[in-house]
């Protein structure tokens, strides 16, 4: 741009200074919401009558279709809202400027100072008008490979935006698109890693722990869970019913684990492996509480299954504690971030023993003693297990369930 732009009051607008800042001084800022707030405040200081702005992104997340980042005058932090899958099928979205821009419109502009007779009812415009906004514009934010997102700007100035104000805003969009795409892809990479390997493992991978054999030793309480008779169910039930069954079962098991500070490292067919690092002094207690809540969730799920004419789900849980190697295991080109070690093997053997012992949860002596729960448990005796020379002491909840033992 050759020089400063001027509004009708002949005030210079230093759009080049804002552009230079956006290019050169945001590299160390990790989050796009912070950059967006700073950008909006700089635009206001430069003389653009901006009172509200939003960024709308489609994101790759197992729970959310998209995210909206909102700034408005007076806010020092952005307001972030997530949107469920299915929102794009709603009448509200289909009548919105977001729909128009996402489907090819180069701009949607709305004078909010006066409603017209032919105006299509729109809750967004009505809300903005009620809040004193006078002008609104929605513009595409073009990312690479044809991915289109949306940015909107609103003014509360009488008469709304002048042409020069819109020129300033549109001149920033190519750079804002690049800056936002980098942050969005970083967030997507982090989200995908967290989805598939868990938050702790994803942090290590993003920090560079990607070579085969790299890892750390972690002291942790270990939980291994397995669904009973899954092979039979998968043979008898339709595929979609089997997937629904597994998702319900994993929700019932995993949500209490994560709620109490555990990390699920792996889903293994119809089973899962989770750890509770002993860096948290309540790790063992948290694990027991997670099992208790999972038992309740599974019981509720079984009631629903029985009401639908399905069989109740059985499960087995093995619990141990000890040092485990936590890191990259695999071939030269395909790695898995997981835990290995004798303590994991014992937890797995305990889970297998639940069938023989006819108890849904079995715990090792090492775990029970560390948790200080020896009096709450029933000692079932020493059991020989495959791969170990000596039998292992096995405990179960004397009351039958973790929930009753609390």
Enumerate the language-model features and the residues they cover.
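Helix-loop-beta substructure at the N-terminus of cytosolic sensory domains
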Residues: 12, 28-70, 74-76, 260
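Cytosolic regulatory/linker segments at or just downstream of nucleotide-handling modules
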Residues: 354-406
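Regulatory sensory and allosteric helical modules in signal-transduction proteins
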Residues: 74-134
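Regulatory cytosolic signal-relay segments
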Residues: 164-217
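Regulatory loop-to-helix N-cap segments in sensory/regulatory domains
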Residues: 2, 154-170, 339
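Catalytic NTP-binding/metal-coordinating core of nucleotidyl cyclase/transferase enzymes
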Residues: 211-289
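Short hydrophobic beta-strand micro-motif common in sensory/regulatory domains
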Residues: 134-143
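Short helix/loop segment flanking the catalytic signature motif in cyclic-nucleotide metabolism enzymes
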Residues: 235-238, 267-313, 319, 338-346
């Amino acid at each position: 741009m050759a020089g400063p732009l001027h509004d009708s009051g002949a005030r210079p607008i230093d759009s080049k200074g804002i552009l230079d800042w956006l290019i050169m001084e945001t590299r160390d800022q990790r989050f796009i919401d912070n950059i967006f707030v700073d950008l909006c405040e700089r635009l206001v200081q430069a003389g653009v009558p901006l009172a509200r702005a939003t960024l709308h992104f489609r994101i790759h997340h197992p729970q959310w279709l998209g995210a909206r980042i909102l700034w408005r005058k007076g806010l020092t932090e952005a307001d972030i809202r997530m949107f469920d899958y299915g929102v794009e099928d709603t009448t509200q979205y289909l009548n919105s400027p977001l729909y128009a821009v996402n489907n090819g419109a180069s701009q949607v502009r709305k004078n909010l100072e006066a409603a017209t007779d032919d105006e299509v009812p729109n809750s967004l415009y009505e809300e903005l008008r009620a809040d004193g906004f006078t002008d609104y514009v929605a513009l595409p934010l073009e990312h690479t490979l044809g991915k289109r997102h949306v940015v909107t700007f609103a003014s509360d100035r009488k008469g709304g935006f002048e042409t020069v104000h819109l020129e300033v805003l549109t001149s920033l969009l190519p750079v804002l698109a690049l800056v936002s795409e980098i942050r969005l892809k970083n967030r997507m990479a982090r989200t995908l890693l967290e989805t598939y390997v868990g938050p702790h493992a994803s942090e290590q991978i993003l920090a560079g722990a990607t070579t085969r054999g790299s890892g750390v030793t972690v002291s942790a309480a270990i939980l291994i869970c397995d669904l009973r008779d899954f092979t039979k169910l998968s043979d008898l039930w339709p595929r979609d019913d089997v997937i629904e069954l597994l998702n319900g079962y994993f929700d019932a098991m995993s949500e209490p684990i994560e709620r109490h500070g555990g990390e699920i490292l792996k889903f293994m067919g119809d089973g899962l492996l989770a750890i509770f690092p002993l860096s948290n002094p309540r790790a063992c207690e948290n694990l027991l509480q997670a099992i208790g809540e999972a038992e309740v969730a599974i019981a509720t799920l079984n009631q629903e299954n029985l009401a639908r004419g399905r069989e109740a789900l059985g499960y087995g849980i093995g619990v141990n504690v000890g040092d485990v190697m936590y890191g990259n295991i695999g071939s030269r080109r395909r790695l898995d971030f997981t835990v290995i070690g004798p303590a994991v093997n014992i937890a797995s053997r305990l889970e297998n023993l639940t069938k023989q012992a006819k108890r849904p949860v079995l715990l090792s002596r090492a775990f029970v003693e560390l948790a200080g729960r020896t009096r709450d448990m029933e000692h079932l005796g020493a059991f020989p297990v495959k791969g170990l020379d000596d039998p292992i002491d096995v405990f179960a909840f004397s009351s039958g369930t973790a929930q009753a033992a609390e």
